UniProtKB/Swiss-Prot annotation:
This is tRNA-2-methylthio-N(6)-dimethylallyladenosine synthase. It comes from Magnetococcus marinus (strain ATCC BAA-1437 / JCM 17883 / MC-1). The gene is miaB. Its EC number is 2.8.4.3. Binds 2 [4Fe-4S] clusters. One cluster is coordinated with 3 cysteines and an exchangeable S-adenosyl-L-methionine. It is an enzyme of class 2 (transferase).
Amino acid sequence: MKHLYIKTFGCQMNSYDSTRMADLLGESHAFQSTDDPEKADLIILNTCHIREKAEDKLFSELGRLRPLAERGVILAVGGCVGQAEGRTIFSRAPYVRMVFGPQNYHKLPQMIQRALDGETRVIAEDIPSVDKFDNLPQVRAQGVVGQVTVQEGCDKFCAFCVVPYTRGREWSRPVAAILAETEALAQQGVREVLLLGQNVNAYAGVDEEGVSYDLALLIRRVALIEGIERIRFVTSHPVDMNEDLVEVFGEIEQLAPYLHLPIQSGSDAILAAMQRGHTVEEYCTWVEKVRAVCPDVALASDFIVGFPGETEQDFQATLDLISRLGFDHAYSFKYSSRPGTPAADMPEQVDEAEKSRRLERLQQLLNTQQLQRNKARVGRRESVLVEGVSKKRDGELSGRSGTLRTVNFAGPVALIGQFVDVEIVEGLPNSLRGRLV
């Protein structure tokens, strides 16, 4: 029996891609997944290219895996670094046998066979016109929460971002394919589905009768699938928000009260330099509209500090925005220059020490805010999807609420996979504790 080890870097779409690679190679070459690279015959590193740090992690990991490659394990680099760097990876790590981009993993069976036949450098770095999803086996559930890619790529070309170059232009899967995949997951016990896209609210699909669907209509259709009791979607762009999407937050019971809507900066000047296409007030208006129909919605955002030209006043505007709106979840980063993007050549680059100082201040505010908002949940009753045994305490279970908060509580393992009501008794920095009601 051959074993496959996949290590995933970066976004949730990469996580989805990794599960589909495992499905594909299990069917084509009978690979069985393992969590131990020492036992693997094939190792795939599914990579992220958004930040330089992620790329550095890749080559550090390749160095650690080199002894395994030298004893015959096939080492492959997939994902966005594979797309962006291509043959350069072979130069920096000549023991790597395969390189492929995120739009090419449906070719893995043929690539693996070429490597098994002795080819030492197998590469697929084009962005093909063929729909890769048509060449994948039926999805296999990995638990009670499932992921379904509905949209890929990006047409926004933000000044800092490589996604349009590594994932390609915006493209939406057909409605029928999405529904079929979601139904298959539901039949395997999935109760919550996460609809994925680089710009998921730019979804523009068509059903078998030629009817056009936006994300709001797609959510309404997914909500009709038997067994699917909770729906989320990530990641959205403020430019693609619309009134129909706001309405579903107030009308579709299965839609989780959670909105990941990255703003990146609280300064209009920096948003313009980033080529984001919207202002701070336009962003706030959409947040207010969603909160009007769904008051309990959890707001999540990404923030970048130290973008070229960011002054102390610009940075303070970001802190002010955070204080004004209140964020339940946030992902914050120092600006990382990516080759080929407009921001890489901009003047007034902020030095690393200042970036670090700003990031620390930003995270302190976000952490304080998150703890306050978690403590405010005490005494509330939450519907929690039980995902497994808690890693915090023996005898406890762990799940997530509709607002994507981790909730730990005492209960029997028979509850795993079910929705249960939990009263929150303690708010912690990154989670909640509760008791079964």
